[in-house]
Regions:
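Short, small/acidic-rich helices and loops at N termini and domain boundaries
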Residues: 1-76, 261
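Glycine-biased, small-residue-rich flexible motifs in mid-sequence functional cores and linkers
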Residues: 5, 64-276
Length: 276
């Protein structure tokens, strides 16, 4: 995980065939296929800080051999050619209940309108009231309001946040208290990026595929045509997950839709009304 930049389709497939130890030995020796070597950074990374953090209990490293590994999500990502994670750094509930209880991803615009913020919070609370977890990347706007809506349900709300950085980085910085409240309330923070990894745009897009894969359904509350949230919808659709789009004002740029979200808008309206 230290030597690669997700998504790593070739390295993941190679490790699945040979096992991680033998795969690493072959990569070190330079005898792995060119596609695998192209996904590996040089020189070999220093793992001492990672091992110290694991020993101290600051985080948990989940691997495909663990009972808590999200097998369905990893399998679907690998089968679709999207790239399954090699492992997951986790902070929060050690039982990872939210990973196995079919979360609903609620995502959307960072610059949400008051309408979008209200609907996101209502969805978060309504889903949490049914003992279903909310999943997203804890971004500003729609995502943060959905998480806060879930947390407002008398401690019942559980959240799964997929980070585009190391588990110890705390990004967005303004959401430090929110992330701590999530882990204190039985939720989890998950990332495929090692400790200390800084966020950047490409990692944000790579993260979206995990949000989609770990969720049973995705709801787009508001999103412009270039919104990163639409990457979640497209991946979810590609993986065969349900995708919904909340109808919004036709005059609003954050209620723009593409073909992926447009065909699901009526379903989202029906789902939204029935969940109230």
């Amino acid at each position: 995980m230290r030597a690669t930049e997700p998504p790593t389709q070739s390295v993941g497939a190679y490790a699945a065939v040979h096992g991680p130890v033998e795969a690493a030995d072959r990569i070190r020796a330079g005898c792995a296929p060119p596609a695998v070597l192209a996904e590996v950074a040089q020189p070999e990374p220093d793992l001492r800080d990672d091992l110290a953090a694991l020993e101290a209990g600051h985080a948990r490293l989940l691997t495909p051999e663990d009972d808590d590994w999200p097998n369905a999500a990893a399998h679907d990502l690998a089968a679709s050619g999207t790239g399954a994670p090699l492992g997951l750094w986790v902070c929060g509930d050690p039982q990872l209940g939210v990973l196995t209880a079919g979360p609903v991803a609620v995502v959307g615009s960072l610059a949400a309108s008051p309408y979008g913020e209200y609907v996101a919070a209502e969805l978060g609370q309504g889903v949490a009231d049914r003992d279903i977890a909310i999943a997203n990347g804890a971004g500003f706007g729609v995502e943060a309001h959905a998480l806060r809506g879930a947390l407002s349900t008398s401690g019942r709300g559980r959240c799964l946040v997929v980070l585009a950085c190391g588990i110890d980085v705390g990004y967005p910085a303004d959401h430090g208290p929110l992330l701590r409240e999530i882990t204190d309330s039985g939720g989890v923070l998950v990332t495929e990026y090692p400790l200390g990894t800084k966020p950047r745009r490409t990692r944000g897009y790579a993260r979206q595929r995990l949000v989609a894969a770990l969720s049973e359904a995705t709801v787009i509350v508001e999103a412009g045509r270039r919104s990163p949230a639409l990457a979640v919808a497209r991946t979810a659709s590609r993986l065969g997950r349900r995708v919904y789009a909340v109808p919004g004002p036709v005059t609003s740029a954050t209620s723009a839709v593409d073909r992926t979200t447009e065909r699901h808008a009526d379903q989202a309206y029906t789902w939204l009304i029935s969940s109230r």
